[in-house]
A protein has these predicted regions:
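Polybasic, lysine-enriched low-complexity intrinsically disordered terminal tails
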Residues: 1-21
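Short, contiguous pre-domain boundary segments
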Residues: 20-32
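Active-site SXXK
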Residues: 41-48, 67, 90-119, 193-201, ...
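Short, surface-exposed loop or secondary-structure junction motifs
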Residues: 79, 131-355
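Short, conserved catalytic-motif segment at the N-terminal edge
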Residues: 31-94, 116-119
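Low-complexity, glycine/alanine/valine/leucine- and proline-rich hydrophobic stretches
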Residues: 344-391, 403
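Short, glycine/proline-biased beta-turn/loop segments that scaffold the active-site neighborhood
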Residues: 116-131
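Short loop/turn microsegments at loop-to-beta-strand junctions
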Residues: 57-59, 70, 207, 367-370
Length: 410
């Protein structure tokens, strides 16, 4: 957890890499994409100011429109305590953004006819608790409407990367609500089961790491993305450091324990992937383009549309509601698609900002990683931050940066 005094790298050295990266994307090329150069410069300056003010430690960011990148930079520190600067190709633990990869592979199984949204989870994992077997479907898992137990740490730390051990621990667990009647974000339980479904349906009996690599990361050219901390990426890993002392349902110490879970051979389909800002941009671009990128089709447009359309009606997200009510904030609708978060109508605390269109969708990880796509304005935004923040603080910082990014759209 962050207790060290501020370290500083000269502003000129913090800026040098982003300036070099963006030099070829200024002027006419940015204007062709319908982006405001001056506003992108303001956004860049705001991120530098945040880091210099010690609001967080560093950030890697991409702003693009029509697939053309207008801003691509890394600012600040990968590890402030070690005075290690953040580089554009540094590899982040993206935590719950990993769920989006699991979602896409589940959707691809549905397209192949091997699974359905209405499939009962117990038909594939029969050792589940009887009530779960009878009532919970794949749709419930994807929409966080299963009534699932929170189960943040169902096994000892050294076993969190062992999916077999996790599944054995969560299968007997009881539901805490009637499936389909409420929304409560499931940090672990739901996507652990989805990952196990992927494994059990794989005829080649591959590891989950290999399935993700062969079916998603490889085809999309996401060369610096992996489930688990691949050995060749280890020198570029950005450590998980808690900038805030409390994270609601977790302490700062528990947040930093994630560094222990995500090992080279870990299989953690709810939070165990690592990636770079550019690789995550490629994934988001695939979604923006209706499931295809560079001639490689991962999903059909129909699946992307369904996944990024609100499936939870007006229900609030109970997982965050109490936290918001304590701060005097009225909880908004959950606005969850097939796990993807949708911006929705109205004004309020929102990581996607209040300037994005209502159909904007994305995925976010604990304390500072995420992406969103505005399909109406054809914008893709990725922001990965070092120095993780508590949920409401994180949302406020993300909202500010997202609104500044949208202000660059002409």
């Amino acid at each position: 957890m962050k207790k060290t005094p501020k370290s500083r790298v000269q502003s000129s050295s913090l800026r040098s890499e982003s300036q070099a990266r963006n030099a070829s994307r200024t002027g006419k090329s940015i204007k062709k994409a319908g982006l405001n150069v001056d506003q992108l410069n303001r956004l860049s300056a705001a991120i530098h100011q945040d880091v210099e003010a010690d609001l967080y430690d560093g950030a890697a960011c991409i702003v693009a429109r029509h697939g053309m990148i207008g801003l691509h930079e890394a600012v600040g520190f990968a590890n402030r305590a070690a005075n290690r600067p953040l580089h554009i190709d540094d590899v982040f633990n993206i935590l719950s953004v990993s769920k989006a990869f699991t979602d896409v592979i589940v959707l691809s199984l549905i397209e192949r006819g091997e699974l359905a949204l209405t499939t009962r989870v117990g038909d594939i994992i029969p050792e589940l608790n009887a009530r779960v077997k009878e009532a919970v479907t794949v749709f419930n898992l994807l929409t966080h409407t299963a009534g699932s137990p929170q189960a943040l740490f169902p096994v000892a730390a050294e076993l969190m990367g062992n999916l077999d051990a996790v599944i054995k621990a969560i299968c007997p667990m009881e539901l805490i609500a009637v499936p389909g009647q409420s929304v409560s974000y499931s940090p672990l339980w739901g996507h652990a089961l989805l990952g196990e479904i992927i494994r059990r349906l794989d005829r080649a009996q591959r590891t989950l790491r290999d399935i993700f690599q062969n079916e998603l990361f490889g085809p999309l050219g996401m060369k610096d993305t992996a489930m688990g901390r691949r050995k060749d990426l280890s020198s570029r890993i950005v450590p998980i450091v808690a900038h805030d002392l409390s994270f609601g349902n977790m302490s700062a110490k528990e947040v930093e324990e994630h560094n222990r879970y995500i090992t080279e051979d870990a299989e953690i389909p709810w939070m165990g992937c690592v990636s770079t800002v550019y690789d995550l941009f490629r994934f988001a671009e695939m979604l923006r383009r209706g499931g295809e990128l560079d001639g490689v089709r991962i999903l059909s447009p129909a699946s992307v549309k369904q996944a990024t359309t609100v499936q939870t009606g007006a229900l609030a997200n109970d997982y965050y509601a109490l936290m918001m009510e304590k701060q005097g904030i009225k909880p908004p609708p959950a606005n969850i698609g097939l796990d993807f978060q949708i911006r929705g109508e109205g004004v309020g605390p929102n990581a996607m900002g209040n300037l994005t269109s209502p159909g904007t969708y994305g995925k976010f990880g604990l304390g500072g990683t995420g992406f969103w796509v505005d399909p109406e304005r054809d914008v893709t935004f990725v922001f990965l931050r070092s120095g993780l923040l508590e949920h409401l603080n994180d949302t406020a910082r993300y909202q500010r940066i997202s609104d500044m990014a949208m202000a660059a759209i002409l």
